[in-house]
Amino acid sequence: MTSGYWVLLALPATALAGVACERIASDYARRIDAGAAVDGATLCAALRAASTTVFLVCAAASLACVVVLILMRALGPLALARAGACMVLLLLALIDARCRVLPDALTQPLMWAGLLLSAAGLGPAPAAALAGAAAGYLFLRGVNAVFVFWRGHEGMGRGDMKLLAALGAWLGWAPLPEVLLAASLGGALVAVLRWGRQAWRATLPFGPFLAAAGGFGLVRGAVVQFPF
């Protein structure tokens, strides 16, 4: 199958999946703003509310494109799993951008899925995946502890730590410095463009940048060279 035909099917599936994720994230953020708990029940309620005709059409069209790709052997099991992981990352990024929360109902299943796929022989070696999950969480936990000691309050949420742990489970430990570098540079650039000289005082959610860097890592490999 030529790359042109692959793109013709993959891009519509990606766009339709993005529409579905945006709809779910909007409904979830609305419920959180209304006082709902940040838990799996609220997320499930948002999923049910999003199951309208538009959402079902988007999901059906995306599934049809994926099935065609599988039948034409243009999408293997690992690529299919990573596509699903990218959808979850997109949903997490949209939720964090709206209500500054990364729900455990998404980050923890994402991490366990990466570990289980690694154990099944898909993705990095099990030892690398386990080390990546541990390193991702512990590194950001350590950075946050230093920030608390220095400034007297936390600099990031536990959801960021769990998201990096999930990315470590999918990518292994080696690409994590690259993911963090790309996410940090992206966040710094957005802060400077938005607030200028006051950027160092601003706060913005880190989840969207982590999700974007992790998504590029899943789709295209390393973001930058590991030694750098």
Predicted regions span which residues?
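A membrane-topology feature that recognizes alpha-helical transmembrane segments
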Residues: 1-228
